[in-house]
């Protein structure tokens, strides 16, 4: 599997959309502008070109690509990025913490769209938000797709 970070910032405390960055020096100066917080489809395209030119990476990517990061679903471009990486592999996954306020959030809509495009959503479960936010959405994710990887965190 090839794991690709598509999100520079993550703030799981502002659950549905990123509002500020908590990444610290030495990365902070390049993240002052929000345009650098998220990978773009153009950057994803450049990465795909590079991956295709490095045989071991290309072989790994063909098996599986995992889109991850601080919180990949906060990237407003994630559906388009997913489509770009699908040109490299039929097996593209997205990892999320599923710490989302509701089914009406943009993050949830992005996850649903990726499952419609035959992507798989994998999640990390946290006891601190399990009952309030993750449990209701986990059942919905399971209905949208066949199989998933679940990481459990004990806090």
Please report, for each region that a protein language model flagged, where it lies by residue.
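Short, acidic Gly/Pro/Ser/Thr-rich loop/turn segments
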Residues: 11-13, 28
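Short, electropositive alpha-helical surface patch
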Residues: 80-87, 155
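Generic structural signal for well-ordered alpha-helices
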Residues: 45-52, 79-82, 108-112, 135-142
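N-terminal [4Fe-4S]-dependent radical SAM core
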Residues: 1-7, 14-17, 53-61
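Alpha-helix boundary/capping residues
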Residues: 25, 51-54
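Core AdoMet radical
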Residues: 2-3, 23-42, 58-75, 88-104, ...
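Hydrophobic adenine-recognition pocket in adenosine-nucleotide-binding enzymes
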Residues: 9-10, 72
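Cys/His/Pro-rich metal-binding microdomains
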Residues: 11, 19-22
């Amino acid at each position: 599997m090839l794991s690709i970070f598509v999100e520079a910032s993550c703030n799981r405390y502002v659950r549905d959309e990123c509002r500020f960055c908590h990444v610290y020096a030495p990365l902070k100066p390049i993240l002052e502008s929000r345009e650098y917080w998220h990978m773009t489809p153009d950057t994803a395209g450049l990465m795909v070109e590079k991956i295709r030119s490095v045989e071991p990476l290309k072989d790994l990517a063909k098996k599986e690509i995992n889109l991850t990061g601080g919180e990949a679903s906060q990237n407003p471009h994630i559906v388009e990025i997913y489509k770009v990486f699908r040109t490299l592999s039929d097996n593209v996954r997205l990892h999320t913490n599923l710490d989302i306020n509701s089914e009406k959030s943009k993050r949830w809509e992005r996850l649903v769209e990726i499952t419609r495009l035959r992507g798989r959503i994998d999640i990390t479960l946290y006891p601190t938000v399990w009952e309030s936010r993750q449990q209701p959405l986990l059942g919905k994710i399971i209905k949208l797709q066949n199989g998933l990887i679940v990481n459990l965190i004990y806090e």
